[in-house]
Amino acid sequence: MAGPAHWAEARDLGAVGDGRFLNTAVLNRGILELSRSGGGTLHFSPGVYRTGTLWLKTGVTLYLESGATILGSTELADYPETPPPRPTGRLEFGRYALISAVGQQDVGIAGRGRIDGQGSNPNFSKKALIARGWSPVDAYLKRPYGLSFVQCRGVSVRDVTLADLGFWCEDYLDCENVSVQGVNVDSWKPDWNNDGIDVDGCRNVRVSNCSFRAGDDAICLKASYRDCEDVTVTNCTASSLANGIKLGTASNGGFRNIAISNVALDGVQESGITIEIVDGGTLDGVTVQNIAMRNVTAAVFIRLGDMARSWTTGAGRPGIGVLRNVSISDIVAELSPRGNLSTGGSITGLPGHPVENVSISNVRMALRGAFPRGARIDPRSVPEAGANYPEHSMFGPLPAYGLFVRHVRGLALHNVVFSGGGGDGRPAVILDDAGRVDVDGLRPDSMVVLP
């Protein structure tokens, strides 16, 4: 079926691009034959190819020409369950997916075409499924991901558009040598759980020149059961119904050598930059620089918590983790707070478990406060909330309009400027149980240090 160059045309295999014919069997047979012949490219000429789950195999790339669409079926029965990877547990992966690869090597998706999950169909709505009698857990888990790569080596996704997916848009779990380049994700849904991209416990990953419109976290790194390390994210744009750039929450593993740069965020309902360890892992060595934010609720949220979830079977309850060595620089943020949550950001650890060595430099935050003029909040009234799910809004209104810092050892604030705040009576910065603090160029210089 494939010529000497191992190139196969989907239509030549019997695929029909009319948007009605179900191509699942034809396309999976072609993928399998290509892989068995040593690998190659399955080419999609312009047309709309309706399908259920496609199982991507070693050595195979799907190439979608401009005008070609892989259209996900709206029938849940067309998405068989993917066997869980090892280690087993409550891992987040594509149990059901439009395109799935498990334990494969040198796989890819490319071209200027489109992958459309038809996620707006009621069959993919949690609310609609629960109304039909589904349990909340099944309504959450049994919707199909867009792309799901599990324990793969050598993954390339480039130039395609991922639109209207039923669940997470693209997920990479325990993969190595991953390149995601020039991908446009457009899945802005109010049903939540439409993350733009999730990179969980992967090594050597580069995400570049991508755009994300996501109904949940836009760019999300996780470490459910192993470290996420050697990851770069650069030259991307994002909007989100949740967080813009996020590390966490799943974190039995940790984060090492993570570099995020040159990202423009416009329209983020939670925090622009969110960095979390709440499941016992270690975050050590994260750099975030050159980030522009507009219409973002909060700029920075750094949290060491104690949700203490175990993501693998038999792992036991994890202890409190470690969050240290974070550098955030060259940030311009125009904040549009929701309700009375008018604060630029927060950095919080737990008693006896501080966040360590955070540097924030060359930052400009313009705040438009909705806080009552002249109002103040007692800093001692802010709850610890160690076991709560971490979001910038978890503490309620904060006593500082710029930055609230608690349980931190090693903090550098250099050339940090807040504008538009201060009329509500709160100071710009509050330090509570903070040691080894170096402040230079803070404006306005209204900082309260609690004993």
Which role fits each region the language model picked out?
Residues 1-451:
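Extracellular/periplasmic carbohydrate-active domains that bind, remodel
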